[in-house]
Amino acid sequence: MPAPFEKGSEKKGATLFKTRCLQCHTVEAGGPHKVGPNLHGVFGRKSGLAEGYSYTDANKRKGVEWSEQTMSDYLENPKKYIPGTKMAFGGLKKAKDRNDLITYLASATK
């Protein structure tokens, strides 16, 4: 069972995003999709629904609503959480890293 989400360091999360996520994702409103979808407005949205992005059927079928907790569960091991996802990222094994990244994303994607 994944660790429960706890608010982390937004600053450390921003650094993690730059080093682990930015090559495939953007966060700003109107930002482009890259290899992965733009993440603006991701919290509260169901998986596989970012307009204009081509998702796998697995992402569309999962139908999870993204919250801090579901994002943490996903980021621990994306391919286990959504088998068939095209996200190549292996995951963040440390709960602290996930908490920091999600704290940043919760702010940066509003």
UniProtKB/Swiss-Prot annotation:
Modifications the protein undergoes after translation, according to the UniProt entry:
Binds 1 heme c group covalently per subunit.
**Subcellular localization:** Mitochondrion intermembrane space
User: Its domain of life?
Assistant: Eukaryota
| Entry-annotated residues carrying N6,N6,N6-trimethyllysine | K79
Where's it mainly located? mitochondrion
**Which InterPro entries does the protein's record reference?**
Cyt_c-like_dom, Cyt_c-like_dom_sf, Cyt_c_1A/1B
| GO annotations of cellular component type | mitochondrial intermembrane space
Q: Which UniProt keywords apply?
A: Electron transport, Heme, Iron, Metal-binding, Methylation, Mitochondrion, Respiratory chain, Transport
Query: So where does heme c get bound?
Result: C21, C24, H25, M87
| Keyword Mitochondrion (UniProt) | yes
The UniProt entry's sequence similarity note says:
Belongs to the cytochrome c family.
Q: What does this protein do?
A: Electron carrier protein. The oxidized form of the cytochrome c heme group can accept an electron from the heme group of the cytochrome c1 subunit of cytochrome reductase. Cytochrome c then transfers this electron to the cytochrome oxidase complex, the final protein carrier in the mitochondrial electron-transport chain.
Name of protein: Cytochrome c
Q: Give the species this sequence originates from.
A: Komagataella pastoris (Yeast)
